């Protein structure tokens, strides 16, 4: 190989490597996406949400989306979930009312269901992404069903429930995408209509991180589920994550009785 040919190959390799590198520094929401402007109408595709700009990986998200994980997550047939909150610029969550936090108008909550898939870059393939938007006097819901390749997906019309066949842990089952009435039935049974994001659901570490990320004006107190018996604590925690959002003693459509840890 001549020195000229070697030089050309080296330059080509260098250029290819430079193009393949991920951009350095924080990623910001793409202009025109819902994440960039939470007041926009819900888009028709997942790409237009702007939440996952580097698919097929789901780990890269814009700085506007703050990730969080509840201490007691809702059980969904073993599916994992990615949760993000996006506040309008210059706003914070009002946590002065203990476990009935107030969220700024146009706050967005995203929840993405994933199933284990070793062929996917993150080891998890997305199945569905749900979006909740807080309005001044209402709440809006949207759901998006991912394509099989995990690169994009389409918005569901929420008129009828949709079932998606999913294999998780060696078992195949039908994952249910709810209709709008089902969304409302669960969410409207909770005083804030936001599930999994409250003083009883976030750890002190998560609250500290979200405070650093300017989600809270000051770190709120957390209300951990406590009991001397670890097994009882796990049971009460399961109630907290899976039952109390409906069964909390309020006047919501599914609140016929109270399973809060103070009562149960």
Regions found by a protein language model. Give the residues of each.
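C-terminal motif of bacterial Sec signal peptides marking the signal peptidase cleavage site
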Residues: 16-18
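Generic detector of short alpha-helix boundary/capping microenvironments
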Residues: 6-7, 73, 94, 171-174
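Sequence context surrounding c-type heme c attachment/ligation sites in exported
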Residues: 20-29, 100, 118-264
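Bacterial N-terminal signal peptides that target proteins for export
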Residues: 1-9
